[in-house]
Swiss-Prot record:
This is Serine/threonine-protein phosphatase 2A 55 kDa regulatory subunit B delta isoform. It comes from Homo sapiens (Human). The modification Phosphothreonine is found at T308. It comes from the Eukaryota. GO terms for cellular component: cytosol; protein phosphatase type 2A complex. The gene is PPP2R2D.
């Protein structure tokens, strides 16, 4: 994927360079836990970009309109709305604290002038309406302009209220709250292509909700055994098919993916398809089961493929072939020899996400040291890029990074022993149409775009 010029990636079959566009967030060395970004999501048009953090806040950025005087501005986003989505809670029955951290954000397709999104923490899902107001009503009969009631005996004439222009105000209001349906922590939400329902998944169950109904949901998957000592796997991610409203998939900690069809039965305890790659017995180790756990699953925009991310690799599966993936891309194979120390510092349990580009020809996922990886599915080339303040000059090209595993190290390479495992790219998003990407690095949001000469 990296041509002679450097960090290339497909754009209609041509290589191009990625360049820096923006970085959001403070530069402080001591980052507050609440400021760490926990999810990143473009809306369907790509004009809005939402982030959620561990402090329960949602920040929405709006894309700058491109014009002739600023041809490079299509990768620039400015703050549109900020609101507190979730607050910390306490479950008195179980004596458990419920974090405010936003686990996932999912946009609904836009139906009118307002935008809607779902956000969830470990237990509660909320539907938010994001709307603009640039007019206000004046001239009420019973109230003054400051809201005080007028003396009815002093009202001598009937007034017709009029709308007057005001400064643009963006309001975020909670329209629905979906609660008390999950015993375990919610790890996924996914909006159905019927635009009326969505699913939510925790470790052992998947529920189907209607967007208009908050007091009940349908349990469509339940893998909880009668005896919890017999539990061998948990659900790690779930997603609806982008076009077939009856089909969804869910992945497990054993590295398997099950495709279910809701037309077959109300409770999808029997899958329609079962995707699993046979394990090579010669490479089995103590860590095999941990690193095979799938942390993310994403359908391609076309609906023909799905992508799964485990600890060391990204795999692309054809929905018509269950026996093995059609592509396997190694993300950071050089860490295989470091699994023991990664187990000791708990990094081996990090949950990396993955995403497709708009045409499904390239995929992106994160790594350590603020590195992120891109893979060209057509040419099978790949590139490692870095989200760092050092390369954050306007329109500065990103230079490909290489990790050295041997003894001799070139000047432009970094040794595997000097990687910073506290700097990790877990959450990334790719614009649905353009070559604009958003990369979350701790409390910073980096935005990159393809370079225009």
């Amino acid at each position: 994927m990296a041509g002679a010029g450097g960090g290339g990636c497909p754009a209609g079959g041509n290589d191009f360079q990625w360049c820096f566009s923006q970085v959001k967030g403070a530069i402080d060395e001591d980052v507050a836990e609440a400021d760490i970004i926990s999810t990143v999501e473009f809306n369907y048009s790509g004009d809005l970009l939402a982030t959620g953090d561990k402090g329960g806040r949602v920040v929405i950025f709006q894309r700058e309109q491109e014009n002739k005087s600023r041809p490079h501005s299509r990768g620039e986003y400015n703050v549109y709305s900020t609101f507190q989505s979730h607050e910390p809670e306490f479950d008195y029955l179980k004596s458990l604290e419920i974090e405010e951290k936003i686990n996932k954000i999912r946009w609904l397709p836009q139906q009118n002038a307002a935008h809607f999104l779902l956000s969830t923490n470990d237990k509660t899902i909320k539907l938010w309406k994001i709307s603009e107001r640039d007019k206000r009503a004046e001239g009420y009969n019973l109230k003054d302009e400051d809201g005080r009631l007028r003396d009815p005996f002093r009202i001598t004439a009937l007034r017709v209220p009029i709308l007057k222009p005001m400064d643009l105000m963006v309001e975020a209001s909670p329209r629905r709250i979906f609660a008390n349906a999950h015993t375990y922590h919610i790890n996924s939400i996914s909006v159905n292509s019927d635009h009326e329902t969505y699913l939510s998944a925790d470790d052992l169950r998947i529920n189907l909700w209607h967007l208009e109904i908050t007091d009940r949901s349908f349990n469509i998957v339940d893998i909880k055994p009668a005896n919890m000592e017999e539990l061998t796997e948990v659900i790690t991610a779930a997603e609806f098919h982008p076009h077939q409203c009856n089909v969804f998939v869910y992945s497990s900690s054993k590295g398997t993916i099950r495709l279910c069809d809701m037309r077959s039965s109300a409770l999808c305890d029997r899958h329609s398809k079962f995707f699993e790659e046979p394990e090579d017995p010669s490479s089995r180790s103590f860590f095999s089961e941990i690193i095979s756990s799938i942390s993310d699953v994403k359908f391609s925009h076309s609906g023909r493929y799905m992508m799964t991310r485990d600890y060391l690799s990204v795999k692309v599966w054809d929905l018509n072939m269950e026996s093995r993936p059609v592509e396997t891309h190694q993300v950071h194979e050089y860490l295989r020899s470091k699994l023991c120390s990664l187990y000791e510092n708990d990094c081996i349990f990090d949950k990396f996400e993955c995403c497709w580009n708009g045409s499904d020809s390239a995929i992106m996922t994160g790594s350590y040291n603020n590195f992120f990886r891109m893979f060209d599915r057509d040419t099978r080339r790949d590139v490692t890029l870095e989200a760092s303040r050092e390369s954050s000059k306007p329109r500065a090209s990103l230079k490909p990074r290489k990790v050295c595993t041997g003894g001799k190290r070139r000047k432009d390479e970094i040794s595997v022993d000097s990687l910073d495992f506290n700097k990790k790219i877990l959450h990334t998003a790719w614009h649905p149409v353009d070559n604009v990407i958003a990369v979350a690095a701790t409390n910073n949001l980096y935005i990159f775009q393809d370079k225009i000469n």
